[in-house]
């Protein structure tokens, strides 16, 4: 009995670090670099292992930690529409989400709040609220949808994401590649605030066409 317990304990000790390594943040060479005017906040710790660079007509993100990326002057208030085109340049080891956030408040403190809309490489989308350290579902978890493009034969996927409160101010619509995947009553959604980009850890992304239209 004693030897069997010892073997089990040894196995657990070996498995646990390996499982932790599976979800560890990658090392991003040149991490900590951010174009002027942009602000990066990591979910955990600091953003020294996240690299954001101007590239072509957009931004290129090479990530260790999950982050939000925004400009303090990019606000959505009243009816507005925001969009960006995201190219995941290569598949991640685990399916990780990327997309937009709206209604950002207190983003530099512990009481941060925002609503985020993500897609990921398995062809699904997610909409959630963040309130400090807590998050809650708007959509029913990750939802499969044919509008979300999966990686092609070369391993890359390009998706245009939009959050639209302008076309119908009573409604908040979430679109992928021009197709509405989710819509809800805008009342009570706390939309006023900073609009920006959210990307989970270990992703390599190119972002173009980010903008807010009122």
PLM regions: where:
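Extracellular carbohydrate-recognition regions
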Residues: 21-45
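Positively charged n-region of N-terminal signal peptides that target proteins for export
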Residues: 1-4
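Secretory/extracellular carbohydrate-interaction modules
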Residues: 64-134
């Amino acid at each position: 009995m004693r030897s069997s317990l010892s073997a089990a304990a040894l196995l657990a000790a070996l498995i646990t670090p390996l499982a932790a390594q599976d979800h560890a943040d990658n090392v991003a060479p040149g991490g900590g670099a951010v174009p002027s005017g942009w602000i990066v906040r990591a979910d955990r710790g600091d953003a020294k292992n996240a690299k954001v660079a101007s590239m072509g007509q957009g931004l290129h993100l090479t990530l260790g930690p999950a982050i939000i990326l925004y400009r303090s002057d990019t606000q959505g208030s009243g009816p507005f529409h925001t969009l960006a085109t995201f190219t995941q340049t290569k598949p991640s080891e685990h399916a990780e989400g990327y997309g937009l956030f709206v209604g950002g408040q207190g983003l530099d403190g512990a009481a941060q709040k925002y609503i985020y809309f993500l897609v990921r490489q398995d062809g699904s989308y997610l909409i959630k609220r963040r309130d400090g350290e807590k998050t809650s579902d708007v959509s029913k978890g990750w939802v499969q949808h044919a509008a979300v493009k999966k990686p092609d034969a070369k391993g890359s996927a390009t998706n245009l994401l939009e959050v639209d409160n302008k076309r119908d101010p009573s409604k908040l619509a979430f679109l992928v590649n021009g197709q509405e995947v989710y819509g809800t009553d805008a009342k009570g959604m706390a939309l006023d605030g900073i609009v920006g980009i959210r990307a989970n850890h270990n992703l390599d992304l190119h972002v173009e066409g980010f903008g807010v239209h009122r």
